Structure formats: structure tokens, C-alpha cells
């Protein structure tokens, strides 16, 4: 009984830790000015093996499950709400590309706090590593899948000269 109580207490504190840390990372991430995401950093580059996002769908079937991921705007009002996308124009697509970069960065950073569990008991460490991966990697994959497709759409719109609707 004492061991069970200890596990429940540990689970509670780990849950609170992740909730507080991830909400704070997301909140700080939304404060990064857009200008930093307009630059071409290598981390956001679509690599050759990704084949403009096709890799992610071929190996992870992204199209089948990406719509099931909770929209970050529901937890943090500062996160871009893509449901308000009324028109498809270059300004909106550029904003969506910026937000895919922001989301990817936030979720990469959100994995790092798992380091705190490095010295903890093996079970606690493995559960928290699993949680950090399962909570963040799917969102990173979706961003890496969507961004090249949005970039291609932006190129097409710019070629057609559609600046505003």
C-alpha cells in the first residue's frame, strides 16, 4: 500500500511538472516575434529525405490522424487559431508557415525538460521519456508534413500574383 501511495504521489508531481513546464514553454514561444521565424534556419528546412512532406505521410500516415491532435489554441489563446482562416491568400499562408515553425520549435524545446528525470528511478525516467516523446513528436511530424505543402501553395499564389483577396 505504501508503494502504491508513493507511485500515485510521483505520478501526480510528474503530471504537475509537465503541465506547468509545457504551458510556460508554449506561452514563451508565442511571444517570440514573427520576424525570427521568417528567416531560413536549417532546423526548419525541409530535407531531401522528407520529399516535401511525403515521407511523413508514407511512414506515419499523417493524413489519417493529424486532425485528431488537439489544437493548441484551445489551451493557450496566444496560439494561432487556424480555424479563423477565412481566405487563402499569401498573407495568411505566410502566417501559417510561421506558426508551423513556432509550433515545431516549441515542441522540440518541450522535450528537453525530461532531463530532470535523468537521476530518478528507472521506471519514472522511462515513463517520462515516453510521455515527452508521445506528447511532442507527433506535433513535430505534423509541422514537418504541413510546412512544405504550405510553402508550395505560397509559391503558387505568388506566381499567380494573388497578394490579397
From Swiss-Prot:
The keyword Cell membrane applies. Residues 1-28 form the signal peptide. It is an enzyme of class 2 (transferase). It is found in: Cell membrane. Its EC number is 2.3.1.-. InterPro entries: CrtO. It comes from Staphylococcus aureus (strain Newman). GO terms for molecular function: acyltransferase activity. Its main location: membrane. Keywords: Acyltransferase, Carotenoid biosynthesis, Cell membrane, Membrane, Signal, Transferase, Transmembrane, Transmembrane helix. Pathway: Carotenoid biosynthesis; staphyloxanthin biosynthesis; staphyloxanthin from farnesyl diphosphate: step 5/5. The keyword Membrane applies. This is Glycosyl-4,4'-diaponeurosporenoate acyltransferase. Catalyzes the acylation of glycosyl-4,4'-diaponeurosporenoate, i.e. the esterification of glucose at the C6'' position with the carboxyl group of the C(15) fatty acid 12-methyltetradecanoic acid, to yield staphyloxanthin. This is the last step in the biosynthesis of this orange pigment, present in most staphylococci strains. One of its GO terms (biological process) is carotenoid biosynthetic process. It comes from the Bacteria. The chain crosses the membrane at residues 126-145. It is a single-pass membrane protein. Belongs to the acyltransferase CrtO family. The gene is crtO. GO terms for cellular component: plasma membrane.
Amino acid at each position: 500500500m505504501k508503494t502504491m501511495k508513493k507511485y500515485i504521489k510521483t505520478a501526480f508531481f510528474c503530471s504537475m511538472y509537465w503541465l506547468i513546464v509545457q504551458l510556460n514553454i508554449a506561452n514563451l514561444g508565442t511571444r517570440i516575434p514573427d520576424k525570427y521565424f521568417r528567416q531560413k534556419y536549417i532546423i526548419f528546412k525541409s530535407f531531401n529525405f522528407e520529399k516535401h512532406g511525403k515521407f511523413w505521410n508514407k511512414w506515419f500516415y499523417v493524413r489519417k490522424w493529424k486532425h485528431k491532435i488537439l489544437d493548441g489554441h484551445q489551451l493557450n489563446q496566444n496560439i494561432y487559431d487556424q480555424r479563423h482562416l477565412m481566405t487563402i491568400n499569401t498573407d495568411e499562408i505566410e502566417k501559417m508557415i510561421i506558426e508551423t515553425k513556432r509550433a515545431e520549435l516549441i515542441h522540440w524545446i518541450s522535450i528537453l525538460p525530461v532531463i530532470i528525470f535523468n537521476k530518478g528511478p528507472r521506471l519514472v525516467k522511462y515513463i517520462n521519456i515516453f510521455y515527452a516523446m508521445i506528447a511532442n513528436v507527433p506535433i513535430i511530424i505534423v509541422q514537418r508534413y504541413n510546412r512544405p505543402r504550405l510553402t508550395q501553395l505560397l509559391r503558387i499564389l505568388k506566381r499567380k500574383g494573388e497578394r490579397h483577396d
